[in-house]
Amino acid sequence: MSQRADGRSSDELRPVRFVRDFQASPAGAVLAQFGKTRVLCAVSVVDSVPRWMREQNVPGGWLTSEYQMLPGATPERTTRESRRGGPGGRSSEIQRLVGRSLRMAVDLEAVGPRTLYVDCDVLDADGGTRCASICGGMVALEIALRKLRAAGKLSTDPLRRRIAAVSAGVVAGESMLDLCYEEDSAAEVDRKSTRLNS
């Protein structure tokens, strides 16, 4: 195994850290750090469900996600998506991935008639923002569900399992785990994998 630019071996993760209660108002909030990538993941709870659920009499609650990179998250300033009329294709794909992944971890019927909004705001992007959003979103979601349960708003624990994600790729013919931006942009092949605990 060769050593990478940041000193890691090819099968080594970047340092991972979750800073709880990074934001005061949401039901659950963490700063997810994967090396130099930092994503603020916050879960807000709204006591209603989407109209389509009401119209179709779907029991339980819903979980959805929003994802965006802040203008200063990359060396070259990124225009806010709200200034461009809404999320672009990349952000839309990522927020769908985060939402679908986290819905796998929760019994939505046990959530009751509520919507859990998982907001993922990228503060610093150095590769792996999808994976950091899923992992940070999972930690923030668990915090939020515990608070709802402690407040007597949930009769059972809706958390069925935990989920995590990691990237992998082939760079200059070598398989690597947890790609930083420099590696990701040079990768011949890359993928993001999610995993549920059993």
Residue ranges and their predicted role:
Residues T194-S198:
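Conserved small/polar residues in nucleotide/adenosyl-binding loops
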Residues R17-V19, L31-Q33, L40-A42, T64-E66, ...:
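Structured core elements
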Residues V16-V19, S25-V30, S48-R51, M104, ...:
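Glycine-rich, charged/polar anion/phosphate-binding loops
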Residues M1-P26, Q33:
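Short, Gly/Pro- and small/polar-rich lid/capping loops
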Residues S82-P87, C120-T129:
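A short glycine/serine-rich beta->alpha loop
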Residues S2-R8, P15, L108-T115, A150-P158:
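Flexible, glycine/charged-enriched surface loops at secondary-structure junctions
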Residues G128-T156, R160-A187:
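Glycine- and Gly-Pro-enriched alpha-helical subdomains that act as flexible
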Residues A29-V111:
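Glycine-rich, flexible beta-strand/loop modules in the N-terminal catalytic cores of phosphate-handling
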